């Protein structure tokens, strides 16, 4: 027999088989590939060229001979490309040519589709195949229909026509059945049904075209209604295709073994065969329904619909229908009639050996008879209708036999229920082929309409329930079944929108079916009643259709009708195992639709199926029986699982199991697993309680699994399922609910959709499963490589926001929680919590999905997040601090309710001793990093961490991200913590560039960029807040909470004075670990003890001491340089502190290196340095504590000290240039500490180490680089230099000091202000050095009292007062002075 026209024909033509009239793109030199059509040269008076094609170009109407290599067939793909090209500039006439060829192409396509609709179905199965298949398939179908005489309404409508057409139409129809690989063989198995079909279905009136139309299901359903009549015809058909019939018999026998046994005689004689098969079926179905009843004959599931479709696609004419979806699944199966047979066999194997055999028989019979009826459109139409009718009529048994072969569970169910009538899905599959093509394809799924996407998934779940049958046919069967179900009501529409219509039809059918089911459903046991084995199976994998089938089987055992309907749906979907679930669902829907048109008895059966369909479409929420409900739960669980795995991916896999669907399914599966893990928690909160209660009502051990599935993809369908289950739970025979009007069902579907859209985890997964899976996987992968850098956290935040767009916000949060809980490293926990902070703050600032999803989700998960990120115990103290900072930031920004946050803050503080005031225990941020983190080794630079307020600080740059909280932390342990937290919080906001005052009680300072020098203004007038209040740079957001925290800790550390230095004032925060004793040489070897002290005193008005010892002390000290070290130690110490703050070399009076050294010399111990700085006050206190008492008290406050220290650590803190020497954490902490920490500073300070006598320390003149470096007024510098030059030249440290000076101006200005104009001179000098203010900045942070500008405001007069301290130019000198612990830099003096 000549092969039918193949789908691949157009492609073949493109390769060189172009014929007259074919549209092509011809390439002519100098022009783009031009639209043309193959023409006849004779028409243009040209001699044909055998080696070239004669083409006529569109647009220009020119002609040419073109070589084959330059010609390519015009396809849809080429069309799209051309249209895209036309969007831009094109060659003249090109757009016109494209338009013309597109018009011609569309016309050809329409013509082809019409021809294919009529002829292709015939051709696709090939005449022989069609005939044989028709004979066998018809017989089988008839048998099934007969068995399902109760479903007469199904069989009768189509079968009368089939009868008329008899052999020919049957053959054609069988051909289609064969092509669709529907359950024709299964139908064969049910000979009695086949007879019925034969009698009523072979009406010569029915044309192939009609059948094609009938494929929609309406005509077929009608014919199927007369199933028994068709059986008679079926006999004829069998006779016609003797060989096929025999094969059919063989197949029938196999089917028998599969629970849909129909003796070979069945094939031979429709009635007797039907009876035989009925007997066999009855036996297999546990004889629960007599074979004579033909009601629910356990007819063999004909899982060949999918295979037949494949055959069709192979043949090519049916291919147009199967074209897109069936194409993928079918083509691989077989390419020739023989191949088709094989394919059928293969599919049959999927559904069962029986189906395969049946298909074989059908194929052979079709092959034998196909020649005559290959193009018999009427026969084809009839066959399709017959198939549809058979499918509907035998849908219950169909599923049963499918179960048998495909899965023992369904098989058992079929056995338990005589309703196992062999569905004649073959016709359906053919009908639905087109829809299936669309439906099978992912694209089809989407085009089908929203219903298609979601209901399709739900039917898939249903398919999963009856998964055995749906294997072979699921993909095509889905659409086909949908068509069939619609076919009962509106098969044509179903074809167009198989899934959607299928759902709708199922909904419509369901009411009647539900009513009928109400009778039968009560018999069915709910899953909770089902044997634990069945339930267990179901529980094991709701997705697994076999398990669902088992449940169905059990139910069917109790309610054969319900079971058979369920089985039928399963049988319809007898295609691939992967696509089984989806296909089953579709099949169920189709069956339900067909059952709708079936008689009342059949309706009961179909009602079960319809219920399942409804349940499937509604996520198995509407199952009528408790058994149905159980199945529906299984389906819903499976569906949810499938949906979650791949909302539509599962469906897609069913559609294109051989294509990308598998990949999508894999992604969806992984996603589903994750969802299962976290959705169990989220679903219970998100899904309707009804669903949970339903699960509970069901008594399902797998209800949690279903719930999880529901959370993932059941949110759309599960809520419905929940409702349906709830109803069902109320009464196992919840038929009333299930028999709700189709409108109600549709309403439920709408609800489903709403739920899916509302339930983001579900809706997103279903609508954009692939994109969502990709986003989620990307986010999960980002978590594995997450670091604390702003870039890393920002990237992860963007991925999380993308996930929220797909409804995965709860999943992302759950993933973060699990990651936090499983993370063993505390520093990694902090990284993850910072990510939570970033996501939360970003969402809080956003409108839309992200903002609406993450904030409430994080709020609900806060207890778990905090419990995992900040666990109790000493080891997690840093985590608690950082979490506190984040919480405080949230509190400040009102991300969450204040009451909630305060409760958590209190809990965290109570959880650990250091939670509130453990800053002293804080480690440098780098030490908190992973051991293998290269950033840990980057000493001297601030890491670009999330929440870090400092970037890399290099000597020449100002650190604009100095931590404000450093001072805050210094002020109060708890306050410090809070401040650091606030600062950290601010920093944590990646977008937050503004400087935020961490604590309202602290003075708020505003940093101003003055000549690249940040000045801090004391807004609140509280010097404490100066540093903490504001960040030097907009990079505050950059500053990580970690960094801020370390700063706070450092502040705390800063509090403790060096052992040698006088204790900080009580008001200062608890001292951090004692800094290395900064020898408080109370002006150790100050050559002129009076000189050094006065200059320090003059030069270093105690900035911190302003409270206790305001400018007066500093002013007086400058006037009295003679005072010996003790007085100077007080004043000088203050001066030194000031000097150190200013980093003005007060060499003359002291070996300024000493204190500066102490500050800088103890870089290792930032606290010491701070102490030195504060110690400037404190040190002065040490040596001249009594005189400095007030100053120390004032300066004792860490901030003052910090400020002064800042002068010395300006490089580290304030100035970017010097910060490099300091660790980033130090910068964060305080300028002082940073300077001290700064290795360079420390090394340089080492010269001036307090331990080293000032005399021992190298003397460097302040006037040198420091002053010039800071560009202090020459007079001041000269004064300082003069005053201190002869006493002490500044040692080389001054370079460090210079760096510090660069920063120092920063600090000094702040210190100066804070220092109450004591640092006026110093500030003036600093002011002259805008670049230096960094240091000063660092300082003004520490001394909130001093306005940053104050330092700069200090007049040279102050400097003159400090003339003894001419070292101002060499702020390094002050740093050096700080080297003398006895001389508090800040405490020494304050300009009047």
UniProtKB/Swiss-Prot annotation:
InterPro entries: CID_dom, ENTH_VHS, PWWP_dom. GO terms for molecular function: DNA-binding transcription factor activity. Residues 196-215, 239-258, 311-345, 401-417, 1293-1306 have a biased composition (Basic and acidic residues). Expressed in the inflorescence meristem, floral primordia, inflorescence stem, and floral pedicels. Also detected in the shoot apical meristem, stems, leaves, embryos, and roots. Residues 184-354, 384-428, 575-613, 723-766, 957-986, 1014-1356, 1369-1392 are annotated as: Disordered. Disruption phenotype: Hua2 mutations enhance the phenotype of mild ag-4 and elf4 alleles and also induce early flowering by reducing the expression of several MADS genes that act as floral repressors like FLC, FLM/MAF1, MAF2 and SVP. Residues 1215-1225 have a biased composition (Low complexity). The keyword Transcription regulation applies. Residues 771-912 form the CID domain. Transcription factor that functions as a repressor of flowering by enhancing the expression of several genes that delay flowering including FLC, FLM/MAF1, MAF2 and SVP. Also acts in the floral homeotic AGAMOUS (AG) pathway, specifically by processing the AGAMOUS pre-mRNA. Functions in association with HUA1 and HEN4 in AG pre-mRNA processing. Involved in all three aspects of the AG functions, the specification of stamen and carpel identities, the control of floral determinacy, and the spatial restriction of AP1 expression. This is ENHANCER OF AG-4 protein 2.
């Amino acid at each position: 027999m000549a092969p039918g026209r193949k789908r691949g024909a157009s492609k073949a033509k493109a390769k060189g088989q172009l014929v007259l009239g074919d549209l092509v793109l011809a390439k002519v030199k100098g022009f783009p590939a031009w639209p043309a059509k193959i023409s006849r040269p004779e028409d243009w008076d040209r001699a044909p060229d055998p080696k070239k094609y004669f083409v006529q170009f569109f647009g220009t109407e020119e002609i040419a001979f073109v070589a084959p290599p330059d010609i390519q067939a015009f396809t849809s793909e080429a069309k799209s490309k051309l249209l895209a090209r036309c969007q831009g500039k094109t060659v003249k006439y090109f757009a016109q040519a494209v338009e013309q060829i597109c018009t011609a192409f569309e016309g050809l396509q329409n013509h082809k589709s019409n021809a294919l609709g009529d002829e292709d179905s015939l051709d696709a199965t090939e005449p022989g195949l069609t005939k044989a298949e028709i004979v066998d398939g018809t017989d089988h179908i008839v048998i099934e229909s007969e068995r399902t005489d109760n479903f007469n309404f199904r069989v009768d409508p189509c079968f009368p026509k089939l009868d008329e057409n008899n052999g020919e139409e049957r053959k054609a129809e069988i051909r289609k059945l064969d092509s669709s690989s529907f359950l024709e063989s299964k139908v064969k198995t049910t000979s009695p049904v086949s007879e019925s079909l034969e009698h009523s279905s072979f009406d010569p009136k029915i044309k192939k075209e009609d059948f094609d139309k009938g494929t929609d299901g309406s005509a077929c359903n009608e014919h199927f209604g007369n199933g028994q009549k068709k059986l008679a015809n079926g006999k004829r058909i069998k006779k016609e295709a003797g060989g096929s019939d025999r094969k059919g018999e063989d197949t029938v026998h196999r089917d028998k073994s599969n629970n849909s046994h129909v003796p070979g005689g069945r094939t031979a004689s429709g009635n007797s065969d039907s009876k035989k098969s009925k007997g066999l079926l009855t036996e297999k179905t546990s004889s629960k329904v007599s074979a004579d009843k033909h009601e629910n004959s356990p007819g063999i599931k004909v899982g060949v619909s999918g295979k037949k479709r494949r055959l069709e696609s192979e043949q090519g004419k049916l291919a147009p229908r199967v074209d897109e979806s069936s194409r993928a699944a079918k083509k691989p199966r077989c390419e020739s009639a023989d191949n088709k047979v094989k394919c059928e066999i293969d599919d049959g194997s999927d559904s069962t050996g029986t189906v395969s055999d049946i298909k074989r028989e059908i194929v052979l019979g079709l092959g034998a008879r196909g020649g005559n009826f290959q193009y018999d459109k009427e026969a084809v139409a009839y066959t399709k209708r017959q198939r549809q009718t058979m499918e509907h009529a035998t849908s219950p048994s169909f599923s049963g036999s499918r179960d048998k072969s495909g899965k023992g569970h369904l098989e058992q169910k079929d056995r338990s229920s005589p309703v196992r009538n062999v569905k004649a899905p073959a016709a359906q599959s053919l009908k639905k082929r087109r829809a299936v093509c669309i439906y099978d394809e992912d694209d089809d799924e989407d085009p089908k309409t929203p219903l298609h996407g979601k209901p399709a998934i739900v039917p898939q779940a249903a398919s999963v329930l009856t998964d055995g049958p749906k294997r072979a046919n699921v993909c095509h069967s889905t659409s086909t079944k949908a068509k069939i179900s619609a076919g009962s009501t509106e098969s044509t529409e179903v074809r167009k929108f198989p899934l959607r219509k299928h759902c709708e039809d199922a909904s419509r059918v369901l009411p009647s079916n539900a009513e009928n089911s109400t009778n039968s459903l009560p018999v069915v046991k709910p899953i909770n009643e089902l044997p634990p084995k069945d339930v267990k199976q179901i529980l094991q994998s709701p997705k697994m259709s076999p398990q669902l089938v088992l449940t169905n089987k059990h139910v069917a055992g109790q309610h054969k009708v319900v079971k058979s309907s369920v089985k039928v749906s399963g049988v319809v979907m007898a295609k691939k195992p992967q696509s089984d679930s989806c296909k089953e669902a579709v099949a169920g829907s189709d069956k339900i639709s067909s059952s709708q048109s079936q008689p009342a008895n059949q309706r009961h059966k179909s009602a079960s199926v319809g219920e399942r369909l409804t349940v499937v479409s509604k996520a198995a929420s509407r199952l009528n029986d408790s058994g149905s409900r159980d199945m529906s739960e299984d389906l819903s669980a499976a569906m949810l699982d499938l949906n979650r795995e791949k909302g539509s991916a599962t469906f897609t896999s069913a559609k294109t199991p051989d294509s990308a669907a598998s990949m999508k399914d894999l992604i969806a599966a992984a996603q589903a697993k994750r969802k299962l893990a976290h959705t169990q928690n989220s679903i219970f909160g998100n899904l309707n309680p009804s669903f949970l209660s339903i699960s509970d009502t069901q008594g399902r051990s797998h209800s949690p699994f279903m719930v999880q599935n529901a959370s993932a993809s059941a949110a759309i369908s599960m809520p419905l399922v929940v409702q349906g289950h709830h109803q069902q739970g109320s009464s196992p025979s919840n038929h009333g609910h299930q028999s709700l009007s189709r409108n109600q069902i549709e309403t439920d579907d709408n609800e489903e959709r709403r739920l899916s859209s509302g339930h983001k985890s579900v809706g997103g997964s279903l609508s954009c499963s692939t994109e969502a899976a990709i986003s989620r996987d990307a986010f999960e992968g980002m978590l594995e490589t997450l670091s604390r850098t702003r870039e890393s956290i920002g990237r992860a935040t963007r991925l999380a926001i993308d996930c929220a767009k797909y409804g995965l916000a709860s999943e992302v949060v759950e993933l973060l929680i699990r990651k936090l809980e499983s993370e063993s490293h505390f520093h990694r926990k902090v990284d993850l919590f910072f990510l939570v902070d970033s996501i939360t703050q970003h969402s809080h600032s956003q409108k839309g999905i992200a903002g609406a999803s993450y904030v409430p989700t994080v709020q609900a998960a806060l207890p778990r997040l905090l419990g995992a990120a900040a666990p109790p115990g000493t080891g997690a103290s840093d985590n608690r601090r950082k979490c506190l900072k984040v919480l405080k930031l949230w509190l400040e920004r009102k991300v969450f309710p204040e009451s909630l946050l305060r409760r958590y803050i209190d809990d965290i503080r109570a959880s650990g001793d250091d939670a509130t005031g453990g800053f002293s225990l804080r480690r440098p941020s780098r030490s908190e990093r992973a051991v293998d983190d290269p950033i840990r080794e980057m000493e001297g630079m601030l890491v670009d961490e999330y929440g870090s307020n400092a970037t890399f600080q290099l000597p020449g740059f100002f650190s604009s991200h100095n931590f404000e909280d450093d001072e805050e932390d210094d002020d109060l342990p708890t306050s410090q913590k809070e401040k650091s937290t606030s600062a950290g919080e601010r920093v944590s906001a990646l977008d937050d560039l503004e400087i935020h005052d961490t604590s309202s009680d602290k003075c708020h300072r505003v940093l101003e960029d003055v000549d690249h020098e940040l000045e801090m203004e004391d807004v609140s007038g509280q010097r404490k807040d100066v540093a903490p209040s504001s960040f030097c740079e907009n990079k505050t957001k950059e500053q990580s909470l970690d960094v801020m925290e370390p700063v706070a800790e450092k502040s705390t550390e800063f509090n403790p004075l060096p052992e040698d230095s006088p204790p900080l004032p009580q008001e200062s925060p608890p001292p951090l670990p004692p800094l290395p004793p900064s020898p408080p040489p109370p002006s150790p070897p100050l050559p002129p003890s009076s000189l050094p002290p006065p200059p320090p005193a003059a030069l270093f008005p105690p900035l911190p001491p302003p409270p206790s010892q305001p400018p007066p002390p500093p002013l007086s000290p400058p006037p009295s340089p003679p005072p010996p070290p003790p007085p100077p130690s007080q004043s000088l110490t203050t001066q030194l502190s000031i000097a150190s703050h200013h980093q003005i070399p007060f060499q003359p009076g002291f070996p300024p290196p000493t204190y500066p050294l102490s500050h800088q010399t103890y870089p290792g111990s930032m606290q010491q340095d701070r102490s030195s700085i504060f110690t400037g006050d404190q040190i002065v206190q040490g040596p001249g504590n009594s005189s400095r008492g007030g100053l120390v008290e004032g300066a004792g406050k860490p901030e003052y000290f910090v400020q002064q220290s800042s002068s010395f650590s300006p490089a580290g803190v304030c100035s970017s240039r010097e910060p490099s020497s300091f660790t980033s954490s130090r910068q964060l902490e305080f300028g002082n500490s940073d300077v001290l920490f700064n290795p360079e500073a420390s090394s340089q300070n080492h010269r001036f180490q307090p331990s080293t006598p000032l005399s021992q320390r190298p003397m460097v003149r302040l006037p040198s680089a420091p002053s010039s470096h800071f560009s202090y007024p020459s007079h001041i510098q000269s004064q300082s230099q003069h005053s201190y030059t002869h006493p002490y030249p500044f040692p080389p440290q001054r370079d460090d000091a210079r760096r510090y000076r660069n920063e120092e101006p920063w600090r000094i200005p702040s210190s100066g202000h804070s220092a109450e104009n004591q640092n006026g001179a110093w500030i003036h000098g600093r002011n002259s050095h805008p670049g230096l203010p960094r240091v000063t900045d660092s300082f003004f942070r520490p001394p909130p009292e001093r306005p940053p500008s104050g330092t700069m405001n200090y007049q040279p007069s102050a400097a003159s007062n400090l003339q003894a301290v001419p070292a101002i130019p060499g702020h390094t000198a002050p740093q050096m002075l700080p080297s003398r612990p006895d001389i508090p830099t800040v405490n020494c003096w304050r300009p009047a």
